[in-house]
Amino acid sequence: MTILNHTLGFPRVGLRRELKKAQESYWAGNSTREELLAVGRELRARHWDQQKQAGIDLLPVGDFAWYDHVLTTSLLLGNVPARHQNKDGSVDIDTLFRIGRGRAPTGEPAAAAEMTKWFNTNYHYMVPEFVKGQQFKLTWTQLLEEVDEALALGHKVKPVLLGPVTYLWLGKVKGEQFDRLSLLNDILPVYQQVLAELAKRGIEWVQIDEPALVLELPQAWLDAYKPAYDALQGQVKLLLTTYFEGVTPNLDTITALPVQGLHVDLVHGKDDVAELHKRLPSDWLLSAGLINGRNVWRADLTEKYAQIKDIVGKRDLWVASSCSLLHSPIDLSVETRLDAEVKSWFAFALQKCHELALLRDALNSGDTAALAEWSAPIQARRHSTRVHNPAVEKRLAAITAQDSQRANVYEVRAEAQRARFKLPAWPTTTIGSFPQTTEIRTLRLDFKKGNLDANNYRTGIAEHIKQAIVEQERLGLDVLVHGEAERNDMVEYFGEHLDGFVFTQNGWVQSYGSRCVKPPIVIGDVSRPAPITVEWAKYAQSLTDKPVKGMLTGPVTILCWSFPREDVSRETIAKQIALALRDEVADLEAAGIGIIQIDEPALREGLPLRRSDWDAYLQWGVEAFRINAAVAKDDTQIHTHMCYCEFNDIMDSIAALDADVITIETSRSDMELLESFEEFDYPNEIGPGVYDIHSPNVPSVEWIEALLKKAAKRIPAERLWVNPDCGLKTRGWPETRAALANMVQAAQNLRRG
């Protein structure tokens, strides 16, 4: 029983973000479709080779995507919304981009599909749309073409396919309502056809991803698995693959399925290996997800070995990453600026492949010397002075309930704020960032590289802030922002100014489409050595008589969008960040900033996957926000912003944040999200996003007015704000000016009645 290793997927974007650059060049009309496709082929070949060289036995194929893998699955199944279809019914890469972005180099622009978070990660997928009576057929053969590519290169491959039940679970019904699970029998023939094609190619194992099996699914959905997999059995061996949580609660459903193996996430789940071994059919293969695919820490391989060694030789066993390595940066070896001690604590995707090779070899041979050597730095870290700050730990221990309470209730605060700001009805604002032009990015890059001194850098940033204020005044916005020209990323910027974080040069991970983020890494206790945002906020406010918002990223979002420590709880990290940012709120207020926005777009994304675990998380998540905000005086207006959210199931917690104003992303869901606020009778002010900033399309005045009127049927007009869905960082100035001008005009029309 030789033990093999495999990964569930590999980062797609390339070490230098080659995919991002190729996509954006193609979208801008600067390169051809053939050139784009060639970059994809080159990246896939390189990534398969890198994994193979690092010691991976079975290479994933089908993990590559031009936008996201759920959208790839939609095209595979022929699920293309009518508004995105080609006139001749064909499907091509531009069809895919129209669904994701709303437009492509060919075809007519149309509203992009809704985008939401992939389980509890910071990766996004395009939500499949289902309509009654829908037909499915094998349409987009990318998976088969990539399998042919890999086989031609001589690789031993394991195709990756998103499973049918999870695919339906992730989608939404459009138009006339019906049970989307009823489409299962319609999509299964396409899956059968794909598996038959893979069998023809001599494929032995297919990784079929069913991460929905870690959720607390309704019984009807659990019951759907058996007939679904009865229909799919027999053509190839199926490795039923789960991740992000354990499977024990749904193990009875799983063990009844006609599959040949099961992958479990032994990092994020609480499954007991001995229990799994006992309950799984004896002829099943167990794929043990022992190496964390979602973090950057070097594994203690001696611990991983101990976790699995008792079942070695007792059943077929593979060792694997816990989930796809998509969520990890590619290669630690190119990081030249990290301190040597700190660098020795990390492992990126390629190093994780090496860890899997070390683990496989030790399990096959029984020789653990290499594991002990590899694990030494991470064991030494536990005693490092870089990790522990007694002053932070003492302050955290001293927190009382009073520290998370504003002085007065919303009604009292709202009166003080109305008297201070005297805003019109339907007040207009933006979410914070303005277009990050080439000039802004070049300015920051030159400063970072040492090609520009601090004085010239500050002069340049000040000029961009001034331009942003002038633009907003010209447009007639009521509450302004400074535009965030000095910020590379809403989390990275704060991490750079807080102790306890480190940064990489090339630690990029994909967020969606061509968007990549470079998450900070929390390595120790968090504190704020000096004010972070005060100087630029104060400067922006000096340029205008209108209020300028101070802009902070909230503690839960900084936590969720960073790679966290693994030696303390997430709650501890969030509250340490909250205390650091509490001091920032006090300093902004002292500098005359009267409106302070604390963005928490990730609050819902941080939810545990099982609802039974939600309360504990929401309790400390809300408390962290309140610790951050509660230092503000009554006439200081606290805003928060959230995006890509389903709110109805956490409305109590959103109300408990006690923000004076919440801005939310609603345009893609056609104001659907406001239902939750209406039903809950949300007491504070709301800015429902009136246009989708992820698409370059400019909304008309009439469109925005119609959305606002729809919103006013649910929320009293005197409590409504007018704003875009999200920050405008990724847009160009021409469409930004046009969209905001229409937004301001719509608000003015409504004021006139």
Swiss-Prot record:
UniProt cross-references to PANTHER family, sorted A to Z: 5-METHYLTETRAHYDROPTEROYLTRIGLUTAMATE--HOMOCYSTEINE METHYLTRANSFERASE
Source organism of this protein record: Escherichia fergusonii (strain ATCC 35469 / DSM 13698 / CCUG 18766 / IAM 14443 / JCM 21226 / LMG 7866 / NBRC 102419 / NCTC 12128 / CDC 0568-73)
Protein function: Catalyzes the transfer of a methyl group from 5-methyltetrahydrofolate to homocysteine resulting in methionine formation.
Molecular function via GO: 5-methyltetrahydropteroyltriglutamate-homocysteine S-methyltransferase activity; zinc ion binding
Amino acids binding L-methionine: 431-433, 484, 599
Pathway(s) where this gene product acts: Amino-acid biosynthesis; L-methionine biosynthesis via de novo pathway; L-methionine from L-homocysteine (MetE route): step 1/1
Gene that this polypeptide is encoded by: metE
Active site residues per record: 694
HAMAP family attached to this UniProt entry: Meth_synth
Requisite cofactors: Zn(2+)
Family, per entry: Belongs to the vitamin-B12 independent methionine synthase family.
This protein's name: 5-methyltetrahydropteroyltriglutamate--homocysteine methyltransferase
